[in-house]
Amino acid sequence: LILITFLRKEEILKGDSTLVDDVPPHKKSEKTGCLPNMTKTLKSNYIKLLEKTKNLVTLNSAASILHWDMQTKMPPKGIQMRSLQLAMLSRFSHKMITDPEIGRLLKSTLKHPEYDSLDPIQKRNLYLIKKNYNEQTKLPEELVVKITKQQAITIDVWKKAKATKKFLKFKPELEKLFKLKKQAAEILMKVKETATPYDALVDIFEPKMSSEAISKVFKELKDGLTSLIKKCETSPKQPDTSILNHPISTKTQQKIGKLLAEFIGYDVTTINSGGRIDETEHPFTTGYYDDVRITTHYYPNRFASSIFSIMHEGGHAIYEQNLKKEWMFQPVGEACSMGFHESQSRFVENIVGRSREFWSYFFPKLKKMTNRVLSDLTLDNFVYAINHVKPSKIRIEADEVTYSLHIIIRFNLERDLFAEKITIDELPQVWNESYNKHLGVSIENDSKGVMQDTHWASGLYGYFPSYALGNIYSGQLLASMEDDLQDWRTQIAKGDFINVKQWLIKNVHDYGNLHNPKDLIKIISGKELDVKPYLNYLNEKYSRLYEF
């Protein structure tokens, strides 16, 4: 999970890419100030708009740190004050983005006779500022403040309810937040001209993507995954996953995590580091450019959990840290979408982190750091165990084959909630029925069911589809990368992640928010959003592991 800053919660959205051609960003002008021939008025307007955006980003980055503190260091009694602090910051943020002067500056700039002299990056900045302004001016300030305050309260109650396994403790606050988010979604639906309120929320995280389009893509994905799962389950060759239950102390897991971070180039140890790893109930990433923080959760008898959550969140972190420094504080300096964000985290976690090549390098280090606790494990048995395909109850611990089914279930529930086909009161029952139907597992309590994720407590409705879309993007990215780096697996086996990381920087991170996701994936892969490369990757990998 990338914990969205207020900048994204308040919808600095990604817009129509027709303003931008398909020239790679490193071949464009990287200065987004003013062109030499820009008139004084046009230049002045553009600079003022960027200054206002910088102020907004700076304020919202402070809010994101308060969110981080709330889930990592804040004492339990601090929640009431923290909710007031965040509510006040959201009020200031809303006032800043809805400042009438922004409207006047945009109108003057967009109608200026020399507007066409601006380069594509400048036009994209203006487009995104305008889109955000138009949408935010329609949201009442008091509604924005209420949502922010309720989010803080709901997250706090969620933690306590999850610990006691009682949804009834969580339900009242969740209902309050859902009603507020639905109210906002209904307003945004009209502004964005989406088909449904839920589509308006999906658009925040995956611009120009509708629930109807997602449903079609997810059907193809589900059909392919269901077939593969059956092949894995019926294979006579099955791994021994009990080897992953060796007790490893939290202190040792922390050391392992730092070494993993070092491998992917996420610095959490030097005096010039721009990251850190902390412990929370639910892993997340937050921050901006040079201060990007990740969290994980340590289980003494499930050490692999923190390994892969750190790889996952680390993938998010290196995306944020490697966005163009020249674009910092500008709308184009944001990530493309949450789907692309998840493509980076899933790529690092699974395509790299669960590969045999990576573990041929890292496994000896793991055994050494655990003081021979894992001495009875072999590389082959370990790699097989961490890639075991088995339907499970917990999303963040699911294998990469069944994982997307967890997302499809959540997507269906969210869509039905906003369509009023189900209610918050019915969520636990429908959740349990869905898990039994699609994954064949029984949920014994709500902590392992409807309350396992932080997203709904955080008001992040519409985010879940990004995970499965990220998987699909990662498959297309892999296919493209293999054309450029045929020996990437050999490099990983030698402990060298540099060329893979540089490929991701050049082909994903460098583009920032210059394009919509549907256009960016086509620029990178030459194809529209396509499930086949991801399914091909999975089938090739697991047919080798399970020998079918």
State what each model feature region is.
Residues 34-210, 514, 532, 539-548:
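A well-structured
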Residues 40-45, 61-64, 77, 81, ...:
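C-terminal, non-catalytic "cap/extension" segments appended to globular domains
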Residues 49, 189, 312, 345, ...:
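Divalent metal-coordination and catalytic microenvironments
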Residues 147-303, 542:
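Contiguous, non-catalytic segments that form substrate-binding/exosite surfaces or channel walls
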Residues 305-324, 342-346:
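Active-site recognition of the HExxH zinc-binding catalytic motif
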Residues 334-374:
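Post-HExxH zinc-binding segment in Zn-dependent metallohydrolases
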